């Protein structure tokens, strides 16, 4: 680059990009490294560039945000095109057969036997997003018709609602299947009378033997009236648990016998296995495939987004729709989604909680891949949504690294997280400023957001500060025993004294000194940082600065200087934090 105008133009480009990324306000300190990174040969002119950048950034910050975006698009179309290309990559593909429906209706249908995890959140987010894109309707439906095997938990209904709300998911209608059982009975009677179902009153073993011999149950060929009478007997309590089921007639030629004449209703002893909502009111319960298919039709669902483990269920449900003359919704099957190094299996988490003896706090433990666990760890709903939309609606299995999730989260929380000083395993040092003088310093809570505030500190000779033992030992291991106390000065460590050598930052840079965080002892609180690593929860004890704002940050993301991002969980009686990521 040789022309003066070219230099100003490249500074303008990075000033505009930085401003648009940060709410319309660019920072000189962020623009200069971008310019020098793109043109390393300009490093010798760093002072000149800094002066020009200050003026250009000032003019950019005076522009309305719309003007900034307009200027970037006009002057630097390649930058805008690159942004649009990245947005296009995250755009969801169109739903199939949309034009054949008056309105797009999607649903999320969890079993309330536990809280939801990242894998469950995928169909919820995608279904909600598609309904939003097509200005359609989104339904939340609790599928809780198995009080024996997949027993619903009374607390799970509200927990799932809370998790969905936190994720930014709002639903237009809500249904609970256990409150709709009479509707399923009505449809079952209709199905029987259309010749689409029969009552199997043999044992499971006898039925499987018949199938293996190529035979069918005698009731399959009986009149609808006969099977309806048997079904009414099921409802009246004539049969006990396991003595009779209602089966949907299917193609008998399937090699996979689980698809043949699948079970639509079974008897459950609800005196032994009461339902958390309806207790023992019903003993005949619809299976997942029956209740789900019926509700999808009655609720007008047009597109079902669910895991590919439901591929066979789509085949099963096809026969029910054909018997009743209903149109089957379009099914989109997703591959499994895994979050590397996290436990996501419901059954495994339940087992751990049962057997751990209190070592885990519950479904919200930050070592779990539950939505509550990720939230507890400081992962934002926006970051979860972003990675889900990036993965999209693919049938292939996908694995998300925590590093990728953390990268998305960092983009969201870095611009808003206050910086706090945390010192692990602290060593106490006495300050000596040479002539007994004091040093006044102003330390911003955020390097680019002055509105977040600053701390004003006055450090005098005789004051006691705390630094980490690791930083203390590192300084002593170096020739000269020097380090720089962040935003304060350069000090030589002599035993338990910190003796001022110089205030200039350039001195520290020339000598390659470590720039370390510190806490004024009289303005400190004991703190514990919990760091999840796989199935382990490491505890780090230390000291955190007791600023006037600390209490305000409870429940919020913060950045511990030179440690990483964390979420502040409690202020009193003890400051506790959970590590999020670097």
Regions found by a protein language model. Give the residues of each.
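Residue-level signal for inorganic ion chemistry
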Residues: 127, 160, 191, 296, ...
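N-terminal Rossmann-like or analogous alpha/beta NTP/dinucleotide-binding catalytic cores
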Residues: 2-28, 34-219, 309-343, 352-357
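Glycine- and acidic
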Residues: 106-113, 139-146, 297-305, 365-371, ...
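Proteolytic maturation boundary segments
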Residues: 51-59, 63-96, 436-467, 512-515, ...
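Structured alpha-helical segments in the cores of large, soluble enzyme domains
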Residues: 122-132, 156-157, 161-164, 280, ...
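Active-site cores that bind ATP or allylic diphosphates and position pyrophosphate for catalysis
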Residues: 190, 194-350, 359-360, 370, ...
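C-terminal accessory/binding modules appended to enzymatic or scaffolding proteins
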Residues: 38, 101, 437-582
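Extended, domain-scale alpha-helical bundle/helix-rich regions
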Residues: 19, 23-39, 43-46, 363-455
